């Protein structure tokens, strides 16, 4: 049964904190724990989580704000569950941050936290709603409102993160899948298919692959394993098709092998899709090559405020997706939520966020995308780019007119087959110095003497992005750069960017919890600085104001 936690709003007269000497109590109230309690813990709307609990009269739940606070502390400090529970039981700062006055209050076993995670995960699978993300947005919106953080300008950046999976070779992954299927079989089926399984049960999958030396040997074993998997799938389909291990084996076979006239052939490495299975323990992790590095896991996308007039910047959005998802798709998915919750009008990103998905999402929106770099080859500096032309739009955001660098304005019309076109006066173009220098893309046609410039709506959007990029460069202020340190702050508790959990949902929860902790620490520093300056100016006023009266 759900019950809100209001006990912490009435502190006990005698508590662990109140028994501290005055000096230590002052340190406690000036630490992160005070900010965590007031700026996060007290802001949590527990009713968001009411749907996880029974409506029938029954035993009340462990306070949701305590459980959520523990998730944030685990992510923020990079603790294991054991370390988290020890700190919950004995660390005065942690208990103070969670509104617990006495060391014996709020006792529960660590399994309660596991059940809470299970409820969150089950609800997400059923509804597609991440309640932890909802709570993060609710708390952050309240912080933004109360601390008067401007949200018109925001910046966004993505980073690669890994879940807690083994970096397995292709052969090792296949053998591990076979071993997992063997474990779910009945004794009779294990005995019936013992000849098929026997070569792959002598030790771990890693032991099996260690004995295979050379590329040719690996290819031979891949072919043998493929034939075995094909045979097992046929033999076990009727009895085990609903089992998760069988479904994983079927997926691996489809991704790694091709069937030609009942003969099994392993696919070449280059034929494998980036979304192919990377681990039997994490079915959503994907593969990506970025630069000279290879990654297995997920991509996290972080958005934060960046108005130069803000004394405090806060993270407003955290997304996690398989790492083969393009940055422009992440921007497109985040945009409606950011517009609904904030006053977003300018979004600053790197070059990776420009693309068809983001262009489509930004069409007709009052949000300006500024990229600090542009995808693709650098254009010829001698020739004019479409960004050098001025395009006018109607209220429906449809391009209507275009003005060339020489100042000639003409209407934009549909092309004969696809795209758009503009036709310029041949007499003006013939006398244009830019045309004489060979810098203009518009050229005369055989049947029509007018100079033709053909382009597509996609090219217009790309040109507008380039124009915004060049204007941003002229300002000499790179507002995007600092978001990289924010990403680093969110990833810092996780060694080498590898999280202690598996699966997209759990990875998302841990990244959101870490972002909450980053926000709390920023608020703590902000409030500390404010208190310092207010104390300093009060002291300055008390010292010099009497002197001014004497001199007067």
Model-derived features: where do they sit?
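Alpha-helical support elements that line or immediately flank enzyme active sites
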Residues: 68-78
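DNA-recognition alpha helix
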Residues: 84-97, 139-140
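Short amphipathic helix-turn modules centered on a small-residue break
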Residues: 48-54, 96-103
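Double-stranded DNA-binding cores of transcription factors and transposases
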Residues: 64-65
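Basic, low-complexity segments
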Residues: 1-56
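Anion-binding and metal-coordination hotspots
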Residues: 83, 102, 106, 114-552
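A short glycine/serine-rich beta->alpha loop
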Residues: 52-60, 320, 501-503
């Amino acid at each position: 049964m759900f019950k809100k936690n209001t006990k912490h709003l009435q502190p006990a007269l005698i508590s662990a904190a109140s028994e501290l000497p005055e000096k230590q109590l002052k340190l406690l109230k000036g630490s992160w724990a005070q900010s965590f309690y007031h700026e996060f813990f007290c802001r949590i709307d527990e009713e968001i989580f009411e749907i996880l609990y029974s409506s029938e009269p029954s035993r009340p739940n462990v306070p949701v704000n305590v459980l959520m606070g523990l998730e944030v502390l685990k992510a923020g400090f990079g603790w294991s569950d054991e370390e988290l529970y020890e700190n919950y039981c004995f660390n005065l700062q942690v208990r103070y941050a969670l509104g617990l006055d006495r060391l014996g209050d709020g006792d529960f076993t660590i399994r309660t936290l596991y059940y809470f995670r299970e409820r969150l995960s089950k609800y997400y699978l059923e509804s597609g709603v991440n309640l932890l993300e909802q709570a993060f947005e609710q708390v952050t919106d309240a912080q933004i409102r109360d601390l008067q953080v401007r949200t018109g300008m925001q910046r966004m950046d993505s980073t690669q993160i890994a879940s807690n999976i083994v970096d397995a070779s292709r052969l090792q992954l296949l053998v591990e899948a076979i071993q997992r299927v063997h474990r779910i079989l009945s004794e009779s089926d294990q005995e019936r298919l013992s000849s098929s399984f026997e070569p792959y049960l002598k030790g771990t999958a890693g032991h099996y692959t260690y004995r295979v030396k050379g590329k040719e040997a690996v290819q031979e074993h891949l072919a043998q394993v493929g034939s075995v998997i094909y045979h097992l799938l046929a033999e076990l389909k009727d009895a085990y098709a609903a089992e998760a291990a069988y479904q994983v084996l079927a997926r691996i076979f489809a991704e790694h092998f091709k069937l030609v006239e009942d003969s099994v052939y392993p696919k070449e490495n280059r034929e494998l899709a980036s979304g192919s299975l990377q681990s039997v323990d994490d079915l959503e992790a994907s593969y990506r090559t970025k630069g000279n590095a290879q990654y297995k896991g997920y991509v996290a996308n972080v958005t934060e405020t960046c108005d130069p007039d803000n004394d405090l910047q806060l993270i407003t959005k955290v997304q996690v997706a398989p790492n083969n998802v393009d940055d422009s798709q992440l921007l497109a998915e985040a945009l409606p939520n950011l517009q609904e919750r904030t006053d977003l009008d300018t979004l600053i990103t790197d070059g990776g966020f420009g693309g068809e998905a983001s262009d489509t999402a930004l069409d007709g929106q009052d949000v300006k995308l500024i990229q600090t770099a542009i995808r693709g080859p650098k254009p010829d500096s001698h020739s004019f780019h479409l960004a050098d032309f001025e395009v006018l739009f109607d209220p429906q955001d449809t391009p209507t007119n275009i003005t060339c660098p020489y100042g000639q304005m003409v209407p934009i019309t549909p092309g004969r087959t696809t795209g758009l076109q503009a036709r310029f006066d041949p007499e003006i173009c013939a006398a244009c110095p830019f045309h004489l220098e060979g810098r203009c893309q518009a050229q005369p046609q055989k049947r029509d003497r007018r100079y033709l410039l053909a382009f597509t709506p996609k090219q217009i959007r790309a040109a507008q992005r380039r124009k915004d990029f060049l204007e941003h460069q002229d300002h000499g202020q790179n507002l995007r750069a600092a978001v990289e340190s924010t990403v680093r702050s969110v990833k810092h508790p996780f060694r080498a960017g590898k999280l202690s959990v598996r699966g997209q949902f759990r990875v998302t929860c841990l990244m959101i919890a870490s972002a909450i902790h980053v926000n709390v620490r920023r608020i703590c520093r902000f409030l500390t600085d404010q208190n310092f300056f207010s104390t300093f100016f009060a002291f300055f006023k008390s010292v010099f104001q009497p002197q001014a009266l004497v001199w007067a």
